[in-house]
Regions:
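Short beta-strand boundary microenvironments
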Residues: 27-109, 123-125, 129
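Membrane-interface junction motifs in transport/secretion proteins
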Residues: 1-27, 156-160
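Long hydrophobic segments that form regular secondary structure
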Residues: 1-4, 111, 119
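Structural motif
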Residues: 18-20, 97-101, 162
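Peri-transmembrane interface segments
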Residues: 2-4, 60, 169-214
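Active-site lining segments that contact anionic ligands and/or coordinate catalytic metals
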Residues: 10-12, 39, 47, 58-60, ...
Length: 214
């Protein structure tokens, strides 16, 4: 699971925006972050809980749509788990789907799944299957999303890349970002990695206790 936040999700922080945030406030936040010391890159994302369906199975998943594809590979790594082959974001009218999700749905590249978002149900072709360890994901290019749903999504997350992952830097950055009314929450990749490390250490202790008890 730790590999997810080290090798596959390669951004350092994620600001989640309120559903009622207006464009002017979003632009002000972006401008401030672009000028904030140490911030290298930003990427707007749309993130929404969905259902993926085939004749065999229904899976709860997360739909991810980047506003721009030009720097997407700086924030996420799309690759085949077995071969290590690196993929570009699909622009052939199809989606990227996480590996375990594809396995559970019984689909491969070239197959079609049903995407249910609220009251909308659309058919989506799978172009690539990507390595993933935590949760289930489907990724759509912004133009494909518009084609399927009749308009652009309300981009509700802002991903950040920077080098300084020290506690002092991230505390100051978090305090700055949370001064904006339009921001609901901020999460740091370093915190997620720490949580996973702590969980694994706890499991190791449990295993040792079980072995000693046995």
């Amino acid at each position: 699971a730790k590999n997810q936040f080290v090798s596959l999700f390669t951004y350092q922080a994620n600001a989640v925006l309120n559903s009622d945030v207006d464009e002017s406030e979003k632009e002000a936040l972006q401008t401030d972050l672009e000028n904030y010391s140490g911030i290298d890159e930003l990427l707007e994302m749309y993130c929404q809980n969905i259902e993926l369906q085939t004749d065999k199975k229904t899976v709860d998943a997360v739909l991810e749509v980047p506003k721009e594809l030009t720097n997407f590979n700086d924030f996420y790594a799309f690759r085949d788990r077995k071969s290590g082959e690196v993929y570009e974001f699909p622009t052939d009218g199809g989606a990227a789907i996480s590996e375990k999700t594809a396995t559970m749905l019984g689909v491969k590249a070239g197959d079609t799944v049903q995407l249910k978002k609220g009251d909308d149900i659309v058919d989506v072709k799978i172009s690539i299957i990507v390595e993933n360890y935590v949760r289930h994901y489907l990724y759509l290019a912004p133009d494909l999303y518009e084609e399927l749903f009749g308009g652009a999504p309300d981009y509700n997350q802002l991903l950040m890349k920077y080098q300084d992952m020290s506690g002092n830097y991230e505390t100051a950055l978090g305090e700055k970002i949370m001064t904006y009314d339009g921001v609901a929450a901020i999460s740091f990749t370093s915190d997620l990695i720490d949580q996973i490390d702590n969980m694994l250490r706890s499991l190791d202790i449990v295993i040792v206790v079980l072995i000693v008890s046995a």
